[in-house]
Amino acid sequence: MTLAVILELDTIVKVIANYFNTTPSIVVEKKNQYAKNLSFEYVQITNDFVPYNIQDLLNIFYTVLDSGYDKFTFYCPNEYLDCVNDIKMISDPENSEILTTLGNYISPYNNFTYFNILYDNLGEITVEVTHLYTDEEINKISNKIDSIWKEIVKPDMTQEDIIYAFHDYIINSTRYDELYEKELAAYELELKEFYQVNGADTTKKAPKFTPTYHSNKATGPLFEKFAICSGYTDAMAIVLDKLGIKNFKVASDTHVWNVAYINNKWMHIDLTWDDPVSKDSSGKIVDTLLHKFYLIDTPTLEEFKIANHNYDKSVYIELK
């Protein structure tokens, strides 16, 4: 995901409000149909949009994302002296994992590709969200999930049976996209060279990332038959949401996978590692389906001692 450059704005409205020592009213719109309204140890849904510390800011940003808002404005109170500085810290591209982590707790349909934070030194904060999925993609994916559901789900299946069936369906119809990482590395080099030449010249358009497959999204495995870990994970998260099962995504520095709350316990599901890239002696890819990382608890996951599964336990506190 990409975090846009922060812009500083001076607004007459905020100046007038500050002069009279009042806080402008906050407009809270209706949440969209994909809002989960779930709170976790790390971050919580809030109805109070006046922040007094960093946790309050995280809760506001999380609520904005979970609600599916395209734009939201709130204000730093005079008592919160470090508010703008904390906003700068959270928004710094060097700290991009702060905002992307919030996206792991929400519906994939409400997740973002750009999260712009505009602020002025008087404390007006405006968030602008560009969502990862378009309405057209959401309709297409939802219809595809419904179609697969009719094909593989039987009336006597339990929730775990349905998860198992989708786990196998996605893996059997998908291959890990080894090309994606090479294309992304080439794009990042191209983008770096662009800014070295053009700097902050806004008349020049930066190149866009155009991978062969949309492997980082649910459209990859469901339609193009290729995925990287985020594509597998989004597809499974959408299924878990459809089942009404509490779930979120877990991210390490190099990987992402699902966890679901089953029988009063958080269980890990890693489709990527259950769909390994295997090749025969001639170098031909061999389709492989495993259940090694299907609904396993945290102690079992940790027994494998896989570096990709080294996540921040101060964030994903529920996983014990």
Where are these regions (language model features)?
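Secondary-structure transition/turn motif
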Residues: 128-135, 262, 272
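Flexible, surface-exposed loop/gating regions in the mature catalytic domains
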Residues: 176-189, 207-249, 256-257, 273
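Secondary-structure boundary elements
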Residues: 133-220
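Extracytoplasmic/secreted proteins, especially bacterial periplasmic and envelope-associated proteins
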Residues: 11, 56, 97, 140, ...
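Hydrophobic/aromatic-rich core segments of domains that either
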Residues: 230-301
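Leloir-type glycosyltransferase catalytic cores
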Residues: 289-320
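Intrinsically disordered, low-complexity N-terminal segments that are enriched in acidic
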Residues: 2-128
